[in-house]
A protein has these predicted regions:
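FAD-dinucleotide binding site
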Residues: 1-438
Length: 438
């Protein structure tokens, strides 16, 4: 078996395939494992760290929770007070307008109820005419049609920290699907892996030993007959790997650049080609003291402002210093980068005056722009009004001896680390089921 990608999806697939007794090789173009899970330790004081990629784990995300515990990793609860909400007041100064951001989510859900009821009649099937009609509208168009007030519009803009897309870019189906789910749409109880989320990827990689090859990029795939032949590039040298099955976990943003012989089915090709990835800039700011802490105040905030959403990135760690994590999605990613280009990190610090940033010194910082990462080309997938909803199942559909995984293939947990883990384990189970039936 060959697994393309050593992110959580690929490593989870390899973990289960090894348990089934398969011989597994994993390749990844990066010089590390983890993919879009990236724990940053270098440069921070007091041996602190924070997540520059996948960060929070919800308590109902069973697959990643079970896998972490299976590997002996502890989950630490974080952000117990949930998210607050920040927006500009009449004088254009940011201020905390809601101690509980869930109220904004509730108002959106209430306004969406007529659309949600219809969507549920279709049993939330994306191949239904109902879903297709909903999906053709952008969130911005729906806000205009329903004469949404400024508060509701600001909440929708703030969701770019969740979907990584602005209301003009995001299909209404994304909101409707989120609020139609049985679980609470707003964030609930949240955790991180103690010591860093990258410990999960590292633990999964240990059994692979010499069967893990980093700095090895997939450049072509041929799938004829009873096997798959994968062309890879390593240190400018081309070679080929033959395998019985290929688990392809690369994001669609990268996958669509890889030639397949023969070509993938037309619907699958179109699904991969059309799927969009959100702009996402993650900035980690370490301060000399945790000035943002105050009685009754949340440690996390959503906002429609240039810095995006922010939260305490290391509340579970000791030390006087503390790290604020800023996630700027969609247009906020561009705005955050502009601030840093013109003013340096000090510009972001000034943008946090409302939180009390003048009461501490910035001692270290790190920024990762995921749309500039050649092996991600974005934070994670989102659905725009141009995506044909009937194509969504094709993202996860096996093709001959190739199975597909990655957060973009998950139905319930698309965009989450749990979606990556779940999809990788599903891909391994699909190979087992296919092999047993032959």
């Amino acid at each position: 078996m060959l697994v393309a990608g050593a992110g959580l999806a690929g490593l989870s697939a390899a973990h289960d395939l090894l348990a089934m007794g398969a011989e597994v090789t994993v390749v990844d173009a990066r010089d590390r494992v983890g993919g879009r899970v990236l724990t940053v330790r270098d440069g921070f004081r007091e041996r602190q760290h924070a997540e520059a990629g996948g960060d929070m784990i919800d308590d109902d995300q069973r697959e990643i929770c079970h896998l972490a515990r299976e590997l002996g990793l502890k989950l630490t609860r974080i952000l117990r007070r949930g998210f607050g909400y920040v927006r500009q007041n009449g004088t254009k100064r940011p201020r905390i307008v809601q101690r509980r951001a869930g109220r904004g989510w509730e108002r959106l859900a209430e306004r969406l109820q007529p659309v949600i009821r219809t969507y549920r009649l279709a049993e939330q099937r994306w191949d239904s005419p109902i879903a297709a009609r909903v999906a053709r509208r952008s969130v911005a168009a729906w806000l205009d049609e329903t004469n949404a007030d400024q508060e509701l519009r600001a909440t929708a803009v703030g969701l770019r920290g969740f979907f990584l897309a602005d209301p003009e870019e995001l299909s209404l189906i994304a909101l409707v699907d989120q609020f139609s789910a049985d679980h609470d749409a707003a964030p609930g109880t949240m955790y991180r892996i103690e010591g860093g989320n990258d410990r999960l990827a590292s633990a999964l990689a240990v059994p692979l030993r010499t069967r893990l090859h980093v700095k090895t990029e997939v450049v072509a795939v041929s799938h004829r007959g009873q096997g798959v032949r994968v062309s890879v590039k390593n240190a400018n040298a081309l070679s080929q790997i033959s395998c019985d099955y290929l688990v392809m976990t690369l994001p669609a943003s990268v996958l669509r650049r890889i030639p397949f012989t023969p070509s993938l089915p037309a619907q699958q090709h179109d699904a991969v080609a059309r799927l969009k990835y959100g702009r996402a800039t993650k900035t980690l700011l370490q301060f000399s003291r945790r000035f943002w802490r105050a009685p009754g105040r949340p440690l996390a905030f959503g906002s429609p402002l240039a810095f995006g959403a922010l939260w305490e990135g290391n509340e579970e760690q000791r030390g006087a210093s503390g790290i604020l994590s800023l996630l700027a999605g969609g247009a906020a990613s561009d705005a955050t980068r502009d601030i840093v280009a013109k003013e340096g990190a000090a510009g972001l610090v000034r943008a946090l005056d409302w939180l009390g940033s003048k009461r501490a010194d910035l001692v270290a910082w790190r920024q990762v722009v995921w749309e500039d990462d050649p092996f991600a080309r974005g934070g994670y997938a989102f659905f725009d009004p141009g995506f044909d909803t009937a194509l969504r199942p094709w993202l996860a559909r096996p093709c001959n001896r190739i199975v597909f995984a990655g957060e973009h293939t998950s139905i319930k947990w698309q965009g989450y680390m749990n979606g990556a883990v779940e999809s990788g384990r599903r891909a391994a189970a699909e190979i087992c089921a296919t092999h047993d039936s032959r």
